A protein has these predicted regions:
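Positively charged n-region of N-terminal signal peptides that target proteins for export
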Residues: 1-7
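Bacterial N-terminal signal peptides
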Residues: 7-17
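N-terminal amphipathic, basic helical "cap/leader" segment at the start of enzyme domains
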Residues: 22-132
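Small-aliphatic-rich amphipathic alpha-helix that forms the alpha element of a beta-alpha
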Residues: 46, 66, 92, 134-136, ...
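Short beta-strand element of the conserved SAM-dependent methyltransferase core
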Residues: 52, 138, 195-199
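Solvent-exposed loop/turn segments at secondary-structure junctions
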Residues: 72-74, 99-100, 142-144, 176, ...
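A glycine-rich helix N-cap at a beta->alpha junction
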Residues: 184-201
Length: 201
């Protein structure tokens, strides 16, 4: 009887461990030495694009670099954007068809928080959004400065997207209530803005 119980315990532990592992996606390290266009060229070429190729996904290396650009940890141990009083209290979530993921910058990984496909909550009356393979949601608990921090992050992503031939746009026409629920935000946290990313159609 004891052997049966022990075997069942081990099996449950292993299954639980596999489930936990499946909920974490380790990201490749960003390539910080790749040659990219000069900053002034990127600023000059930056634009918002509202047409996405739904059949062309974003690879893991590019995903990692997008997230690092938005709110990663730099060589000083700080973030890639400045935050007032070094609060660093912004959160970045990734929405994909396979669920909702939280970007853990310190461990350079995505952590799944839900199997739900929340992309429809970002589309509202703009159907083109559904074609983007990657969606970033910026959230914060700072009503006064959170929008500033998100603006710095999505501008970084704009410039990276321009350098890599990606399409992106900033949007505020989303279902804030449903996203708040789906992202499992605390009462003092709120959704700031949505940034779909992909390749232009």
């Amino acid at each position: 009887m004891e052997k049966i119980c022990y075997t069942a315990f081990v099996a449950a532990f292993l299954i639980g461990g596999q489930a936990l592992a499946a909920d974490v996606q380790k990201l490749p390290q960003p390539d910080l030495t790749q040659p990219l266009p000069a900053l002034m060229e990127l600023l000059n070429a930056r634009q918002s694009v509202r047409s996405f190729n739904k059949d062309k996904p974003i690879d893991e290396q590019t995903l990692s670099e997008i997230l690092w650009t938005a709110f990663g940890v730099n060589k000083h141990g700080k973030r890639t954007i400045a935050t007032a009083r070094n609060e660093q209290n912004m959160k970045v979530f990734v929405l994909r068809e396979d669920g909702i993921w939280f970007y853990n910058a310190a461990d350079n990984q995505l952590e799944k928080i839900s199997e739900e496909n929340a992309i429809p909550f970002t589309a509202e009356k703009q159907a083109f959004v559904n074609n983007a393979p990657l969606h970033l949601i910026y959230t914060s608990s700072d009503m006064h400065l959170g929008h500033n921090h998100a603006g710095s992050a999505y501008q970084n992503v704009y410039l990276y997207a321009t350098a890599k031939g990606l399409a992106t746009v900033i949007r505020g026409l989303v279902n804030f209530e449903e996203l708040h629920r789906a992202l499992k935000l605390n009462k003092d946290e709120f959704v700031i803005v949505h940034q779909p990313i992909g390749y232009a159609e």
